[in-house]
Amino acid sequence: MKSFNIVVCASGGGGNFRSLINHQSSYDYHISLLIVDRECKAINVANENNIPCIVLEKKFLGDSFFEEFAKAIPPDTNLIVLAGFFPIIPQCICDKWERKIINTHPSLLSEYGGKG
């Protein structure tokens, strides 16, 4: 097992997730978990690659969504990659994982951030 553990969070097709999977063998990292906030194609990508997946449906969890999200992240995680993850991560989670979260949003969040 690789020494650098990554948790990927996605909400859609899983294109960025698949790209991260395809490059694991070239770099020293291991994708240990996928977290999604809805049923989406990224789940299929995880299943095809034997990567554990946790589905936390925001519409059902409501206010407890981010509490469950925080619990789902393993303590040995080195990096969280938001790969097309729609929910806007609250400050408390950003503070806990300071300098360990990357957002792959394809545009300026201030201009095109959506509702989250």
Model-derived features with residue positions:
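One-carbon transfer enzymes
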Residues: 1-116
